[in-house]
Regions:
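Hydrophobic, lipid-facing positions within transmembrane beta-strands of outer-membrane proteins
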Residues: 51, 69-73, 102-106, 132-136, ...
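Residue-level signature of outer-membrane beta-barrel architecture
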Residues: 77-79, 110, 124, 140, ...
Length: 256
């Protein structure tokens, strides 16, 4: 019971209308000195702007018919609540020696909970079609520590699409971990010029085994299934194109 007396005394002192606990040291050190100290404390616990560069996946995807190099990463700058985020994803075909896809997103990211950010901005596809899109999405951590990144995209031609990625980190040791990953695409309408049908369009399901050489760098190997779904699968099948493949991947994750 004696251990609780100091806390009760502080509560009683504060409740009598005297100086708040936050400002009690002003009487000893002076209000000006303590105000500066409080500003430093607040700065380092939420007001300080920081930045980061993260390469989620830089990998070689080796399939039966084609080898592709994939880059998936982002850069951000800001504080705990608001950030500027630039995301990029690019696919380069080693067989055709050309970029098959290049997209860049510039987003404002605002924290709506300790674990989720709402994001809004623009996306531009440099390849394959040069279209721009408005973006509205969510990124963060779901219950049971699933990392999620999902968004709706409205193109300049009025087409509405969406995509979501889920990833989970299963630690085997302090450095060795397994990364199951899934991705799903969706379209509100048929987009014939892009070979996309209404409904769920494509999916990916893979697993990677990674090892943290240092905390900022982790090479990995893995396997991933990639396939078209629904009406998109029918469109591609009718055109004589492959609708699914399994690829082996080798690459790394890094951040700074």
């Amino acid at each position: 019971a004696a251990l609780g007396l100091p806390a009760l005394a502080q509560h009683d002192h504060h409740s009598e209308g005297e100086a708040p606990l936050w400002s009690q040291a002003d009487e000893i050190w002076g209000e000006e000195v303590m105000e500066e100290s409080r500003n430093v404390l607040v700065h380092h616990h939420g007001r300080m702007a920081t930045d980061a560069v993260e390469i989620h996946r830089f990998e070689l995807q080796s399939g039966e018919d084609e080898d592709v190099v994939l880059l998936d990463g982002d850069v951000w700058y800001g504080g705990d609540i608001n950030k500027l985020v630039v995301k990029t994803e690019a696919e380069y075909s080693l067989d055709h020696r050309e970029f098959e896809e290049i997209e860049v997103q510039a987003l404002w990211s605002h924290a709506i909970s300790p674990y989720l950010d709402v994001q809004a901005g623009i996306r531009h596809d440099f390849e394959p079609d040069g279209l721009s899109h408005a973006v509205l999405g969510l990124e963060g951590m779901l219950p049971y520590r699933f990392d999620m990144d999902g968004a709706f995209f409205l193109s300049e031609e009025g087409d509405l699409t969406a995509g979501v990625e889920l990833e989970y980190e299963l630690m085997l040791t302090q450095r060795l971990h397994i990364l199951p990953r899934a991705e799903l695409g969706w379209s509100a309408q048929d987009i014939p010029e892009r070979g996309i049908g209404e409904g769920f369009t494509n999916g990916q399901l893979g697993v990677r085994l990674a090892y943290d050489v240092v905390r900022e760098f982790a090479p990995f190997v893995g396997v991933e299934w990639q396939g078209s779904l629904g009406e998109t699968e029918n469109i591609l099948s009718a055109a004589g194109e492959d609708t699914e493949q399994t690829v082996f991947v080798i690459g790394f994750h890094a951040w700074y």
